[in-house]
């Protein structure tokens, strides 16, 4: 839906210049003084909203001036602006028609935390994963020329995203094609000293100004008319210009790829940015603009701890501390349990190493990295490389554990298949954020891993019912000597007692948690405990369910399944994964392979659609995989019939 179809809600500001801004054409009338005040208003609105909703704060605070400069100089939405990842796009949303609904950021039915084409014509390309902007922008530029239209295409990409192979593939292609394309590299890891910044700014303004470009073009045309000597002088002048610039700015790589390099530019000086972008707008061919920004700019807590404020839960704007939580003790998160367990396993096995793709803290590997720095590898945003790197380690007897978010592992499917499983290498995949992730929405849900992993030969796929079982599954994965994946959800554990040491489970064996005679509920992973709760509710209605914790999606516990199908004619499967190709599909395939008929199977999971943003609880309720949904599905299957069988809960 376009934003105009949404109902306005309370504004984020009580006044100020932001209250007068709806669309980019409004900011094009402002002078530098007013733009500076607007930047302050925008930062206040972002901090106020994210403190309540959570979100990606530091990146968005760091790109406020850059956002204003881009929209002031370029004729958006006619000119296309593509944001990479989208973490930095909150200011963009505030000045492109979404100011009055910004308070709904990342909420159910509200605006997305990422650019979304369905939301606004200013959002040119849907994003959420990194490093896609350059390839997308090059495609848009090609389409523009095929249609013989005239508009500028601008991709804005962070320095972290530049570590991915996809970004370099896009650079290589677009530099070779020589289409009109502007890539803005938002570099928030470097700082510029005043002298270098001033000299670089002056040199770049001269080299990119319209007058300089016209003189350069006229001289080149004249020299080309002089046989032999003209071409030599032209080549010498080009090299001299590049050599002078290379002494001052780090743009040689981009120049070699076919781009005109501009920068580095100070990313928080609006006059400086606007002047240079105006020059860039009038240039032809591929241009890379290098802009230096500071993550968390304007909010002291985010400037001091940009990593903690990258993606943050609700917090107090006054103190920067997390919002007050319940005084009751909170179970450890699955991420924490993984981090603690992998350290224990590494102490026992000197061959074990850990790999992450720019998510050391997010995946819980901080303690491992500190205790075993020589056995810890952060490869940057390079998921494909991380998997094949792990495969290479495994061929030499090293035991790699790749810790990665479920949705990001999708980017390395071929590497899992071709480089790990085809060789049957013992690589362990620890898949954090499997299932619903909540407010980050469809780009970040981990709802496909059971389906795409169980389709690969040699792969073992596990999902724990709680945090204690997670540590045992990690031990199992490390010890099994095969490619193995353990997927676990975002958030806190169930609150069960933790065993002091992890141990291996029997490979491919599930467990019966609760026995009854009415029907069988086969659950895997996080839905196991809701299934148990539903069984308790149903007992009061005279429906007695057997609840099975499958543990393994691959291999299945064939012995247990044969016992189930001999005892029940009704089976309900529950998973936090898409139904297509998932755990329920594996059960149906088992029945077909064993020529078993007359069994009614109902599958609960995610329909053939992309799940939208909401809280995890809201999402589970929507798809019927919470205790109420499971109980309702059982009642439907039983037609509210009553069983005379008694239940024995273990």
From Swiss-Prot:
Pathway: Metabolic intermediate biosynthesis; 1-deoxy-D-xylulose 5-phosphate biosynthesis; 1-deoxy-D-xylulose 5-phosphate from D-glyceraldehyde 3-phosphate and pyruvate: step 1/1. Binds 1 Mg(2+) ion per subunit. Binds 1 thiamine pyrophosphate per subunit. One of its GO terms (molecular function) is 1-deoxy-D-xylulose-5-phosphate synthase activity. Mg(2+) binds at residues 159, 188. Disulfide bonds: none annotated. The keyword DNA-binding does not apply. It comes from the Bacteria. It catalyses: D-glyceraldehyde 3-phosphate + pyruvate + H(+) = 1-deoxy-D-xylulose 5-phosphate + CO2. Homodimer. PANTHER family: 1-D-DEOXYXYLULOSE 5-PHOSPHATE SYNTHASE-RELATED, 1-DEOXY-D-XYLULOSE-5-PHOSPHATE SYNTHASE, CHLOROPLASTIC. HAMAP family: DXP_synth (MF_00315). This is 1-deoxy-D-xylulose-5-phosphate synthase. It comes from Syntrophus aciditrophicus (strain SB).
